[in-house]
Amino acid sequence: MTVRVEIRETPGDQEAVLALAEAAAEADGVRPLNEQTLLALRYGGPSGARFLLLYDGDELAGFAYLEPSDPPSGELVVHPGFRGRGLGGRLLAAVLDTGGKGVRLWAHGDLPAAARLAAGFGMTRARALWRMRRPLTTPLPAPELPEGVRLRTFEPGRDEEAWLALNARAFADHPEQGSWTLEDLKRRQQEPWFDPAGFFLAERAGTLVGFHWTKVHAQAEGADGPIGEVYVVGVDPEERGTGLGRALTLAGLAHLRSRGLDQVMLYVDEANTAAVRLYESLGFTRWTVDVMYRR
């Protein structure tokens, strides 16, 4: 069979890619593609994004996606039925050649095979993202808002611009989140899971100063049934140290429990020790790890 890598500006056969990803998830116990990649498959990526499809003959054997960040970042996956033949290396070589110097790639689940592949190309571990979880069947402290702050929920058609401005302030040091555009937000508003009743905003004198956006998964790998998610918590830099982040987190957890959920998860950067300490103080424990490799 002839092996080739096609590099495209559009995703191509979305259904074949999703089927490949599902086969990998069943084999590895962890989903290989994150939300950003799945949205790019559905709607198309931003200008400069690249979709790499590895074919063995006419069969799709691997897939990779590169975001045009600085430096580029993305992820790749090889179908379980095509592993052990050097195709992962073939695809990774194409990714590195396409992305250029400093390419960053996520490996979900910290699997040994991914670590070996990365090491073989001189890539080193650059970041670790923890997935943490806690039961919602145990007691939750009541949220205590700072004086002068009130909570309400997100109103579509009214709050988008103010929320984007707050998100940029809150995540000025984390461009993956802080650089969100109106299009990024609207795409998520179109997703079946979006529920403004679970999108909490904190206001002080009419100005947004914090938020907690929750999410509900019908199913997640490793979870027995539906699970809630602390999707994003953000606090204005001027409000840090006031306890607002803790109060927002607790308000969202209470909402998820009111939905009948008995477990909740979140993602947090291993290096964000303040956030890790907060979540551990609220009963979260480490569940799985995603690793970013960089050359």
Swiss-Prot record:
Recorded superkingdom: Bacteria
Record keyword Repeat present: yes
Top-level enzyme category: transferase
Entry-linked SUPFAM superfamilies: Acyl-CoA N-acyltransferases (Nat) (SSF55729)
Record GO terms (molecular function): mycothiol synthase activity
Gene3D superfamilies in the cross-refs: 3.40.630.30
EC number: 2.3.1.189
Reaction equations catalysed: 1D-myo-inositol 2-(L-cysteinylamino)-2-deoxy-alpha-D-glucopyranoside + acetyl-CoA = mycothiol + CoA + H(+)
UniProt entry tagged with the keyword Repeat: yes
Keywords per UniProt: Acyltransferase, Repeat, Transferase
UniProt-annotated binding residues for 1D-myo-inositol 2-(L-cysteinylamino)-2-deoxy-alpha-D-glucopyranoside: 35, 176, 215, 229, 267
UniProt: acetyl-CoA 2 binding residues: 233-235, 240-246, 272-277
GO BP field: mycothiol biosynthetic process
Domain N-acetyltransferase: 5-141, 149-295
Description of how the protein assembles with itself and partners: Monomer.
Primary role: Catalyzes the transfer of acetyl from acetyl-CoA to desacetylmycothiol (Cys-GlcN-Ins) to form mycothiol.
HAMAP family the UniProt entry points to: MshD
Family: Belongs to the acetyltransferase family. MshD subfamily.
NCBIfam families: mycothiol_MshD (TIGR03448)
Protein name: Mycothiol acetyltransferase
High-level lineage: Bacteria, Bacillati, Actinomycetota, Actinomycetes, Streptosporangiales
